[in-house]
Amino acid sequence: MFDSVDEFIGGLGNPTGTACYLPYHSCGEDYLHNYIGMLGIPLEPYPELNSAHNNIFIAKNAAFDKDIVLKIKELLLSGKNVIITTGLLKAIQDNGFDTITNVRCTDRKAYVNKFAVSDYGIIFNKIAVSEKPVLIPQLEYSTNDSWQLVSGLGSENNFPILIKCSYGKGSLHILTIPDDFGDLYYYPAEALYPIRAAFSHNSNILIDTVSKISLFTYDNGSFIIKSFLPFPQEVTVTVNKSKVSLVDIVSGEQIKGLQCGNKTIFRVQIAPMSYRVYKEI
């Protein structure tokens, strides 16, 4: 394994990804970040909250920080994109978080296996079905303040999976975490794409595929796609630049993409349990 890594490690830059706030000596939603990473979302953990990052993911363990509500408010006022979990929401919603948004996490649950996706939170334009029902917490929210980007569908009802709120110059996204973290893998690809987009707002690389495909990004335009699936899988890669190509760092193969406005879109095949290493050129 190490011999194969030696073939490309020198061509990688410094790792990038959505900043994760993991305070020292904290716990809560333990190991959730591992599951999020398996959804194709690159993460970079930090023990302190750094306002230099534009995208910041905060899970329940951050409730150990007694100033977390104030810190989130300051991040949003400065124009940052903050993503929190339903676990953190429930832990801090009675500690002043209602001054930021009126979304609340209740004790009620819902089983969902149908998902609806909205581009802007106004109408649902995609419906997808998961392989099994997923048990999620139910959120309460006011429609004039919050917008559902992904929703789980019930019987004549719907439940937020990804909800967006605006505050100051920034955006707050709340991600619904199933009772069983492993059920995140059953969120269908159509639901995972807007979740990845929320974590990677204005980032250079975004993938569209099923779960158990991980993405590792670097500051020199290189990235790794790693599959943990037992079968081949197509991955759509969007590079937020026009007129770029990809080169496979290991094989030297060049890949041409499809121009779509100021973006370039590539479709690549990943073999079972394997990886591909690319760089923009």
Predicted segments, located by residue:
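Hydrophobic targeting/anchoring helices
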Residues: 1-42, 174-176, 182-185
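Short boundary motifs at domain starts and secondary-structure transition points
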Residues: 5-17, 47-49, 163-164, 214-216
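Short, surface-exposed connector motifs at secondary-structure boundaries
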Residues: 17, 53-54, 81
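Aromatic side chains
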Residues: 21, 53, 275-278
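A short, well-structured beta->alpha microelement
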Residues: 33-54, 60-63
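A conserved amphipathic helix/loop scaffold
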Residues: 60-281
